Design a protein with these regions (language model features):
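Terminal connector regions
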Residues: 107-134, 497, 577-615, 620-632
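Active-site beta->alpha N-cap acidic-glycine motif
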Residues: 127, 131-226, 233
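Contiguous beta-strand segments within globular domains
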Residues: 36-62, 66-68, 521-529
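Secretory targeting and sorting signals
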Residues: 2-29, 616-628
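Proline/serine/threonine-rich low-complexity linkers at boundaries of modular beta-sandwich domains
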Residues: 27-38, 501-510
Length: 634
């Protein structure tokens, strides 16, 4: 498949944006059979209440005709004509003719609102042709409504994907859209875009020389870096864009995902210092709801606002329905009752920005909100670009419509989150997931998680196998496997990554064995030797746990450094008065059991004889004492 150079794509996108603003209010439409070929209303999309109506009706005829008449009406929302004008021309050839109409809006005595222009064209020998277009009349005193546009690059991880032309094309589209997005943010700072890119994509592009499209990945990263340097905010995100509702109770996983996401951001933007992408306090939870417990973990890690879905927000009683809320988080997660601003994405408005054909309807809806008595604090629009979204060029065209209207004030996410007087809300702890993963998916993840975390604890986070297994595990938790339609059509790839992570962990930890034979102590106390054989070829740090109901274990847990080969450790125990007992010995790493054995501990025969003799001597002495005293009394 032939691909255009990046410069050509960028030029085409810029040209499309430039042309969008000059389109007429109603495109030409073919008329019925007759002399009139087409009729077009030429009008602005909006004008001020104190402005001038400068309108036109363009008529194209098929052949010469004796007479063509055009009338134009301005209809209010009830369909009542508030202004009517009529013009007629005779002896027209096969030409394009434009009827011009002009009138001061103030003379019409109309109020601000949404009106409909209706043109009717008649000609000799043909039926009337009718066309309509929308016209918004705005009062200059109307306060613009803040609109924050967050553009996210959306695609599934490439890890574990079978190489194919389709996969290569998807990767190319994603990287190209990301590059175009960076250029759009730099060339049009007035759009005040906020960007969100899953960190795993940044990591893939950072190692673009290993991918099938190295140049386009590098271009995407370079373009985003320039946008960040220009001051475009970039939201933080967890490494694999995980399903937060599914791992909400696994705090260690959440912290690991956030830490790895931050590391990927820092690696992708090494020279940005305190740029928004690196030091951002905003978080993108755009693949599903944000549970309250997850928000508390994020708040403890420096997040002050989050962009997420509306399904997890529960407005306080009496609070206005809005798209920006102040949420107080629980204090039992280290956040001390911190307040986080939640920017809830408007699904309907977001859909209007995905297609340039719907942008005018979105602008009209925003006008209605701006003119209403209950104005929103902010409207949050989230749109996806990339393989799982729309093209950046389409978003650019739609944005041009919003950027040109006076009732919309585009703001970035940090500015929207900084608004005062936000309504109060809470976050649901267990928001409903309309598209859950297939049965058994998260059980497989949980099994792999125990093994991988054990490997990381034993071998260290810098170990090659540990890092590979952890990456696979975190990617397996990605919500991207659900796909843009939520069908989880890619679930098999996520499960394959989880199983691969577990196998990597087993390949290392499975080489640790435990040999703990039965032992006879020389006395009632002693040390039980335990042999741990480490055949992994690397140094591991594990916990040696000992427990028993019949033997008193003097040290139940010992941290042990296992060097390659045999390692002998001792467990101090005491039998007390018992002659024998059983003790369980476990080798664990971060709670994951690597090996286990049961040891029988007995005291030596000589020790038991000495103990028995001592008891008999004591008993004999007591008996002699009793007999002497009783004899004297007798």
């Amino acid at each position: 498949m032939a691909r255009l150079p990046r410069s050509v794509l960028a030029a085409a996108a810029a040209l499309a944006v430039a042309l969008c603003a000059s389109l007429p209010a109603a495109a030409a439409a073919p008329a019925s059979a007759g002399p009139v070929r087409s009729v077009t209303i030429v009008a602005p999309r909006w004008l001020y209440l104190d402005g001038e109506l400068d309108l036109g009706v363009r008529v194209v005829t098929r052949n010469s005709t004796r007479r063509v008449a055009a009338s134009l009406d301005l209809l209010d929302e009830a369909g009542v004509s508030r202004w009517h004008s009529y013009q007629s021309r005779t002896v027209l050839g096969s030409v394009t003719y434009e009827y011009s109409f002009s009138r001061s809006v103030a003379d019409l005595g109309i109020a601000p609102g949404v009106y409909r222009l209706r043109a009717r064209v008649t000609s000799a020998g043909s039926p009337t042709v009718e066309r309509s277009a929308q016209l918004i009349v705005v009062d200059r005193s109307t306060h613009p409504i803040p609109v924050s546009v967050v553009v996210r690059v959306s695609a599934a991880p490439s890890a574990g994907e079978t190489p194919s032309d389709a996969a290569q094309d998807a990767a190319f589209v994603t990287a190209s859209d990301a590059a175009d997005l960076g250029r759009l943010a730099v060339l049009h700072p007035g759009l005040h875009l906020t960007l969100a890119v899953p960190p795993f994509l940044l990591q893939e592009w950072s190692g673009a020389e290993q991918t099938s499209t190295p140049s386009v990945g590098t271009d995407a990263l370079d373009s985003l870096q320039r946008a960040v340097e220009a001051g475009t905010p970039m939201l933080r995100g967890m490494y694999a864009d995980p399903d937060l509702a599914a791992i909400a109770t696994v705090t260690a996983d959440l912290e690991m995902q956030d830490a790895r996401g931050g590391a990927a951001l820092s690696a992708a933007f090494p020279s940005q210092g305190t740029a928004p992408s690196v030091a951002s306090t905003g978080f993108a939870a755009l693949s599903g709801p944000l549970p309250r417990s997850v928000a508390a973990v994020l708040a403890a890690r420096g997040v002050r606002y989050a962009v997420t879905d509306t399904s997890c927000v529960v407005p306080a009683r009496g609070a206005a329905v809005a798209e920006a809320y102040a949420v107080t988080l629980p204090s039992d997660r280290g956040s001390s009752g911190a307040t986080m601003t939640i920017l809830a994405a408007d699904r309907a408005a977001s859909g209007g920005l995905e297609d340039p054909a719907h942008a005018a309807a979105l602008a009209t809806e925003l006008f209605s909100r701006a003119a209403s008595a209950q104005r929103a604090h902010v409207v949050v629009i989230v749109v996806d670009v990339g393989a799982d979204g729309v093209r950046t060029s389409a978003v650019a065209q739609a944005l041009e419509v919003l950027a040109g209207v006076p009732w919309v004030r585009l703001v970035n996410a940090p500015a929207a989150a900084g608004a005062s007087g936000l309504p109060v809300a809470t976050l649901s702890e267990s928001p409903a997931d309309p598209t859950p993963a297939p049965d058994g998916y998260w059980e497989t993840i949980a099994d792999a998680r125990g093994r991988v975390f054990g490997l990381v604890a034993a071998a260290g986070a810098d170990d090659t196998d540990a890092r590979s297994a952890l990456d696979s595990l975190l990617l397996a938790e990605s919500r991207e496997w659900a796909g843009p339609d939520g069908s989880w059509s890619r679930a098999a790839r996520g499960l394959a990554l989880a199983r691969a992570a577990a196998q990597t962990a087993d390949s290392v930890l499975g080489k640790v064995t435990l040999d703990a034979p039965s032992v006879t102590l020389p006395g009632s106390e002693g040390k039980v030797p335990v042999s741990i054989i480490n055949s992994s070829g690397r140094t591991l740090v594990v916990d040696l746990d000992a427990s028993s109901s019949g033997v008193r274990v003097q040290r139940s847990r010992t941290s042990v450094t296992l060097r390659p080969g045999e390692n002998v450790e001792s467990v101090p125990v005491s039998l007390g008065t018992a002659t024998s007992g059983r003790m369980r010995v476990d080798v664990k790493a971060d709670g994951y059991q690597i090996a286990t054995a049961t040891v029988t501990v007995t005291a030596s025969y000589q020790d038991r004889v000495v103990l028995l003799a001592a008891v008999l001597v004591i008993l004999a002495g007591l008996l002699l004492y009793v007999r002497r005293h009783l004899g004297r009394r007798t």
